[in-house]
Amino acid sequence: MSIAEICNKMYGKTIRECSNEQVYTALLALVKKVTEERKEAQERQEKENGKKVYYISAEFLIGKLLSNNLINLGLYEQVSQELEKNGKNIVQIEEAEPEPSLGNGGLGRLAACFLDSIATLNLNGDGIGINYHLGLFRQVFAQNKQTEHPDYWIQKESWLTKTEVQYPVQFGKLSVMSRMYDIDVTGYEGRVNKLHLFDIDTVDEKIPMHDGIDFDKNAIEKNLTLFLYPDDSDRAGQLLRIYQQYFMVSNAAQLILSECRRKCEKAGKALKNLNEFAVIQINDTHPTMVIPELIRILTTQKDIDGSLMTMQEAAEVVTKTCAYTNHTILAEALETWPLDYLEEVVPQLVPIIRYLDENVRARYTDSSVYIIDENDRVHMAHIDIHYGFSVNGVAKLHTEILMQEELKSFYRIYPEKFNNKTNGITFRRWLLHCNQALAAYIEELIGADFKKEAGELSQLIKYADDENVIARMLEIKAENKKRLAAYMQEKCGVKINPQSVFDIQVKRLHEYKRQQMNALYVIYKYFEIKAGNIPDTPVTVIFGAKAAKAYTIAKDIIHLILCLGELIANDPDVSPYLKVVMVENYNVTMAEKLIPACDISEQISLASKEASGTGNMKFMLNGALTLGTFDGANVEIAQLVGKDNIYTFGASSDEVIAHYKNADYCAKDLYENDEMIKKCVDFIVSDELKQYGDEENLSRLHHEIISKDWFMTLLDFKEYIKVKEQALADYKDRAAWGRKMLINTAMAGFFSSDRTIRQYNTDIWKL
């Protein structure tokens, strides 16, 4: 059925007569129909008893799906042309689509890329998560501060399909009935898998107060699936997080066991063979309770042969089935929960967790590997490592640090469990969709194979000295910058100069990612311009980031950036040469506009703190040059492109780890003994800035940088300035810069999530 037929059937109108919203709904129906047909064909060919991966994650930052699905189904060109013939534009149609608010940062975006690659590689694998009604929050700036509002994204017509699947979930004093919603995951010329999102029918979207995100955290039946990462700065918030996590894994366990029970019966096997039919990938520690929950079910419900497993047997079965991905080196992000909180929310799991801990204590004397510590806190990662068969980091450096530092006690016990799987991104969304001009030009140069085999991009290297190719790549970049400038003017009311250098830092706001260092550079540059040192090319510094509601210093950093933006915009001496923009409510849709237009990609986390990063890969693929520390996947980018095609600076991870061990880093010494550093830091509390900001916020941040600076901003600041100035100077030689751009795109193939998923499958899942 064509779009015209669907429009006629649904609205009794031609495409031309329909509104953009109506055409979007028609396209939604078209895509759902095509995916349904593909699923039916797939099911006819498929072995019902095949092994399947279940990817459990608290976040899936999937982005808008219309164009992505059309590209993956091979319909994008055909649909675009049909719309164009009828006076419609697919980009404008896509504006009618709300972005699902099911994730926040890199963790959720990685999960989305992985689902895309699992389907593209024709692997049998589904995602499992929660159907958050209001997401993290919608960010609005008011008086140069972040404010948080509910993000109502679920519409009557959406990619969500309500199913009849329901499971009972029992908490301590409460039981709820879940409801499963599905989103189809289309692979590029591949299969269709599913993202299963669990919800409750009693959730109440009206309970947030005053258009903010404060609500009664105790009304579990009304709030359970409202928000991603509800504020956990108080006891009620922490309990709600435990409710959410158990809700997710209880549903996951029931779904997995029901599917595997059917497969076992067909194969004449019992659930003690679970690992032959399922592999469960635990994405960070949020889904950890799936391990004790599976053990609970396996020891309380009879197996197919009528037997009941012992605790030991069930633990062995689960250990052979579960694999854990670690995403962090930050101690604060390795989740621990007070045992008495678990006793309140999930009392049925506590005896199992105690049993698992006793097992560990019987085998090992090192208390650092115990599950329950001396303060009666339960270490979720410890459960994953002891009772899973694989533990992977997400970049070479990250995995090394886990094995040698953070998790070395575990590595000594289980060296065979540890492995690295460097993260990747889906090139369908992050090149074919968001940078269509560049993708088309690459196809013109090297053919279409790179769309399925990203390593083919390396063929571009043969054009590194071809002036015409370099000129065209620079031209595409300039077009993308103009497009971004027009979009920012239209959507945000912000005017930016497309002739300026676009220097972009977009990621979750956290002190270790060091947006504060970039802000201090802006202050340095402001002083330089005021002193008459005018840059050859104007610079536009673009930030995009949300700060967790209760993360005070992160919100102070946003306040500083917004104040600097206003100060500079109002200064006629500086504004022609320097612009600071912070995009509101940064999300996947905004990333798709920013990344193709970027010149300098800011990846400036403190070395040893960023597990991998994936923004760095997206920018690299689209021809931005990385300005970064030797952290996460930056290390692998540097190895691939060579030192002449990346701008690196800063203390090494070994040096940083040594500073922490020796407790010998003192920000105050650097501040007091370096005039330039002192001048930049003190500007945070200057009268000039205070006229645009709040003295309390600015003073608190100023004090934090001088007295704590836990992530060593001042340690790397001067070298950061030096290397950034070098990058800006190099930008003037357009041909040389264009060559560096081409080399970055050519070497990006390694960072395809298809490569990552092939490695997961070869080494861990074995589907």
Residue ranges and their predicted role:
Residues 1-767:
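A conserved ligand/cofactor-binding region detector
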